[in-house]
Amino acid sequence: NQLALADCEFVLKLLPSQCTKQNVQDAISCAKDCSLVVALGGASICDIAKIVATTLDLDFILIPSMPSNFGYFTLDSFCQEENVYKKIRTNQAYKILVDENIISKADRKQVINGQKLVLSLYEALFSCQFDNLFYNNKRDLTNLKLQLCKFKDNYEYLQSDTDDSKLVLMDILIELAKATEDMDSINVFDFAFCLKTKSNLPFGTLCLLASKILANLYKQTFEIKNIYKFSLPNFDVIDQNLSSLNINKKSVNFTPLKSMFDNSVYKKINAIKNQCLALCENLENQLSNFSLPADKSELQLDDVCKVMNIAPLVYSCSPLVNMIYGIGLLNIC
């Protein structure tokens, strides 16, 4: 009504609650003659709006409908295409409007489910970051840890279903969003584990097979590839950050190797190798109920590539793909 009174022409589009390639294309066709995109809804609506506005180079305003939505405060969106979730970098929103009336009226059951999901996602994110010695992204892990503790400490209060508790939840999520830009990756990874590729093998099984194959290729690759210092992170800085957080580095062997590579480069490579082997072990424990094919040759290369591409987390946090990226097996744009 306010838009009509202001003599604004507008297109009202009710979008499906899933960010798929087709839904995005439909939304783009509706918005191609518009000068502004305004999105009111949950995470999927937010993702669609961000992709549409970025594609058409339009300003956009986001209005979250749930206090547990965190996609509004990041620059990434995730769009499902067939069996793959693609991570799309989007423009910054012109405005993010948190309406207290909308947030306070959010459904209690959905809010609690959202809280549980967010808590598990951030715990997984924090765990991934300090377990992965090859993680080369400057983030304030201490702030992330503090915000996570704050979330836990206030968890019971946040379930009280009061207007104030929902607003407190939104404030905490905004702080969590500031602590890291890639928490949506954990969400996508969680979904990806439920998907199956065309080979009908569970995603986790493909991860395990891929990690085993890559671990076996490690020695051969190390011998034939030129390793350049600029392609590796500052391991000393990472080591200092981990030490300040009392991180357990038991899976990494720091024994120097007398070879053509200097000690600092070798320590980096050795850490990557051991993280890859540790990932294999972790996956084996997690997938103990799966029966793996006896003949590893049955695994097709394109299926392994699907494993690498299906979850953005594999690129942003996984020691497995960081390992093969660091030694030149995989080029990531």
Protein language model features and the residues they cover:
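Short alpha-helical scaffolding segments that buttress acidic/His motifs in well-ordered protein cores
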Residues: 115, 119, 165-180, 211, ...
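Short glycine/serine/threonine-rich phosphate/pyrophosphate-binding segments
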Residues: 44-51, 69-72, 186-190
